[in-house]
Regions:
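Conserved alpha/beta-hydrolase "acid-adjacent" motif
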Residues: 145-150
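Catalytic histidine neighborhood in serine/cysteine hydrolases
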Residues: 159-174
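Catalytic nucleophile-loop/oxyanion-hole region of alpha/beta-hydrolase
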Residues: 8-44
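Mobile cap/lid helix-loop segments that gate and shape the active-site cleft of serine hydrolases
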Residues: 92-127, 133
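Short beta-strand/loop motif that positions the catalytic acidic residue
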Residues: 137-139
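Short amphipathic alpha-helix adjacent to the substrate-entry channel of hydrolases
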Residues: 1-8
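Primarily recognizes the serine-hydrolase "nucleophile elbow" in alpha/beta-hydrolase
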Residues: 35-100
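Conserved small/polar residues in nucleotide/adenosyl-binding loops
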Residues: 175-181
């Protein structure tokens, strides 16, 4: 923070809430930061989302869906107000296909989980476009919860659209890898 970084934690709705509530909450938060950037000394060209696991799906969802009319219309803002400038996706849930973390999609979609079109819409490797922001991905190859293929699929989709992307793959996964207690 001493170097000018700001960190904001969003406590978004989870089960029993369903799509698109958490997405709208995240979009509203980004719009709030943009609207109040001067007060909070935020560079509006550097609003970067970070999400882990299912939170990675949420962050990536705003990255691929920010231009969808329903978001701006629901929130009463322009699409540019909710656009992330970049994403850091940490072992993200991406695909509802072969390498899915099924529980995440069941929670996200609820009764709509069996609707294959809705599941495919939430399979974010199919939603990447030229408007998806720069992305940093990291994952562990041996992740036994969210398969590494989730990051690989998103990486390949970003490459198809020539979106700047960097990915780090680590060979071994540890429980609670992102917690500082692993260093003790």
């Amino acid at each position: 923070l001493v170097r000018g970084y700001h960190a904001v934690i969003l406590r978004y709705s989870v089960e029993p809430a369903r799509y698109p509530l958490a997405l709208l909450q995240l979009a509203k938060s980004v719009a709030f930061l943009r609207k109040n950037a001067a007060e909070f000394h935020i560079d509006t060209n550097k609003i970067v989302l970070q999400g882990f696991s299912a939170g990675g799906h949420l962050a990536a969802s705003l990255g691929v869906f920010w231009k969808k009319d329903f978001i701006a219309q629901t929130l009463g803002v322009t699409s540019d107000m909710v656009k992330p400038n970049g994403m850091i996706l940490s072992y993200p849930v991406i695909t509802s296909g072969e390498f899915a973390h099924t529980g995440s999609f069941e929670c996200l979609l609820g009764e709509d989980y069996n609707d294959l079109d809705k599941r495919k819409e939430q399979s974010l490797e199919f939603q990447v476009s030229k408007d998806t922001p720069t992305t940093f991905l990291w994952h562990t190859v041996t992740d036994d919860c969210v398969p590494v293929e989730n990051s690989l699929l998103f990486f390949n989709a970003l490459r198809k659209f020539e979106i700047p992307v960097e990915m780090h793959l680590y060979p071994v996964s540890y429980t609670h890898l992102t917690l500082p207690t692993i260093l003790r």
